[in-house]
Regions:
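Bacterial Sec-dependent N-terminal signal peptides
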Residues: 1-24
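CBM-like carbohydrate-recognition segments
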Residues: 25-69, 81-88, 97-115, 119-121, ...
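Long, well-ordered core segments of solenoidal/helical folds
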Residues: 30-49, 89-107, 138-158, 190-216, ...
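Inter-helical turn/loop segments and adjacent helix faces that build the functional surface
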Residues: 82, 183-194, 247-259, 312-318
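Acidic/serine-rich, low-complexity amphipathic helices located in mid- to C-terminal regulatory regions
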Residues: 171-186
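Acidic/Ser/Thr-rich, low-complexity mid-to-C-terminal regulatory regions of eukaryotic proteins
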Residues: 214-235
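Oxyanion-binding "anion nests"
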Residues: 239-287
Length: 382
């Protein structure tokens, strides 16, 4: 009965979702990005659209929470493309309202090391590059200096005390590492990059599966199987791949550590090309396509962003990777409803699960806007 139900779902999806082959035009990319960005800003405080399948996704997100931080990363990219200053104004207002501080959940010392709470700093640095106002970045630099002078000595093991003071869950590689490179570039001080590289390697040594070229979400998944397959969560690996792209985008290609990231990026890109679904998305359990036929737009958008970024920067061959990017982007666009809401965003979690046609989440919108920014360039946008 279970297998019959799965087959029925797959057949339904094959008939529901078209095989995407329509040409991508830069003006249409910009149009759909605006529609999604405008919908999100208008409905940012409306909890009715948020998936409600866990206690973690019921309340309003703090404006500096990682969920919103991921949104702001994508919104910053859209703001740089838009024909209006209102998106920069919206982002700037958030920073001003919070004195340009990073998220301080549960008090300063309780979370000073936590990667999630660093995410919003990436947007502060994007805004600094536009407005040249040092108050936008000073709190971030001060906090990172504190971390450098008082580095966490906890182990990477998931059960270690204060274990998330280190980047021991794969999502962290999106949240914090790009910001360390930004700080280094601004201050012209190598110590921030050195710290980032050391911690990234520690995370990779802990979570990266060298056979599959994918990351476990955290150490609690090492010995678990889902329908007989290893559990590689799509959004978790999306965080990694987008974070990897963002680190490389900030890092000088001549930097001594760039080849390390380049090698890792190429391995992941090759794997992602192999496991993309015919419909254009990636299964929520990356190696379990037949068990997770429902589309999911946050992890997939991050993959599209990273792949398109690689083509645009001459790292990936367009003839090889371009069709996958095109198929993926068209699939994501098909899940934007007529009002501009991006659907099928998996709720907050740590493993494969469910996604819904009438629900969204802020980080999914951020991923979509990030993807659109590179798709726009790839198809001739100026």
């Amino acid at each position: 009965m279970k297998h019959a139900k799965q087959i029925s779902i797959i057949i339904l999806l094959l008939f529901t979702y078209p095989i995407f082959s329509q040409d991508i035009k830069p003006e249409e990319v910009k149009k759909i990005m605006k529609k999604v960005a405008d919908w999100e800003i208008k409905h940012h405080d409306d909890l009715a659209y948020r998936a409600q399948n866990s206690r973690l996704s019921r309340g309003k997100h703090d404006m500096l929470d990682w969920t919103n931080g991921a949104l702001y990363v994508g919104m910053s990219k859209w703001a740089a493309m838009a024909d209006s200053e209102k998106y920069f104004d919206w982002l700037k207002g958030i920073g001003e309202d919070h004195d340009w501080k990073l998220h301080m959940r549960n008090g300063y010392y309780a979370r000073v090391f936590h990667a999630d709470d660093h995410t919003v700093g990436q947007t502060y640095f994007h805004l600094y590059r536009k407005y040249k106002d040092e108050k936008m970045i000073k709190p971030t630099i001060n906090q990172f200096d504190f971390i450098l002078y008082h580095p966490s000595k906890t182990k990477m093991d998931w059960k270690s005390p204060f274990h998330q003071d280190r980047w021991n869950w794969c999502d962290a590689l999106f949240m914090s590492p790009p910001l360390w490179v930004m700080v280094s570039n601004l201050t012209r001080d190598r110590k921030y990059i050195d710290f980032m590289v050391k911690e990234w390697k520690a995370t990779t040594n802990h979570l990266y599966d060298k056979k599959e070229n994918l990351y476990y979400r955290d150490g609690s998944y090492f010995n678990k199987l889902d329908n007989g397959t290893k559990i590689f969560w799509a959004r978790g690996n999306g965080w990694v791949f987008a974070g990897l792209s963002n680190v490389m985008d900030e890092l000088d290609p001549n930097d001594k550590d760039y080849p390390y990231f380049l090698k890792l990026y190429k391995k992941m890109a090759k794997k992602l090309l192999e496991i993309q679904t015919p419909q254009g998305h990636w299964a929520m359990s990356l190696l379990g396509q037949k068990f997770y036929p429902t589309p999911e737009t946050s992890g997939s958008s991050f993959f599209i962003y990273g792949l398109a970024w690689g083509i645009n920067n001459g790292i990936l061959d367009k003839a090889t990777y371009g069709p996958a990017v095109e198929r993926g982007w068209n699939a994501m666009v098909s899940h934007v409803n007529s009002d501009g809401m991006l659907s099928y965003v998996q709720p907050i979690g740590a493993e494969p699960g469910e996604a819904y046609p009438d629900k969204t989440e802020v980080y999914g919108v951020g991923a979509f806007l990030s993807a659109g920014s590179e798709i726009y360039k790839l198809y001739g946008g100026k």
